[in-house]
Curated annotation (Swiss-Prot):
Binds 1 zinc ion per subunit. This is Small ribosomal subunit protein uS14. Pfam families: Ribosomal_S14. GO terms for cellular component: cytoplasm; small ribosomal subunit. Binds 16S rRNA, required for the assembly of 30S particles and may also be responsible for determining the conformation of the 16S rRNA at the A site. Part of the 30S ribosomal subunit. Contacts proteins S3 and S10. GO terms for molecular function: rRNA binding; structural constituent of ribosome; zinc ion binding. Belongs to the universal ribosomal protein uS14 family. Zinc-binding uS14 subfamily. InterPro entries: Ribosomal_uS14 (IPR001209), Ribosomal_uS14_bact (IPR023053), Ribosomal_uS14_CS (IPR018271), Ribosomal_uS14_sf (IPR043140). One of its GO terms (biological process) is translation. The keyword Glycoprotein does not apply. Keywords: Metal-binding, Ribonucleoprotein, Ribosomal protein, RNA-binding, rRNA-binding, Zinc. PANTHER family: 30S RIBOSOMAL PROTEIN S14, SMALL RIBOSOMAL SUBUNIT PROTEIN US14M. The gene is rpsZ.
């Protein structure tokens, strides 16, 4: 889990647009966040395995 201060800091509008970054909506992780889902890879994988994300299926070949 991210520190509450870092989550609050990311919610503020940055002074310059390029300073903005995404955080996982579920756990607050700042790295490897999928924009389409708003989730990090860890949360995305957990939710996909439990079937909580409609249309996401496990790939097999």
């Amino acid at each position: 889990m991210a520190k509450k201060a870092l989550i609050e800091k990311s919610n503020r509008k940055p002074k310059y647009a390029v300073r903005g970054y995404t955080r996982c909506q579920r756990c607050g992780r700042s790295r490897s966040v999928y924009r389409g889902f708003g989730l990090c890879r860890v949360c995305l994988r957990q939710m996909a395995h439990r079937g909580e994300l409609p249309g996401v299926t496990k790939s097999s070949w």
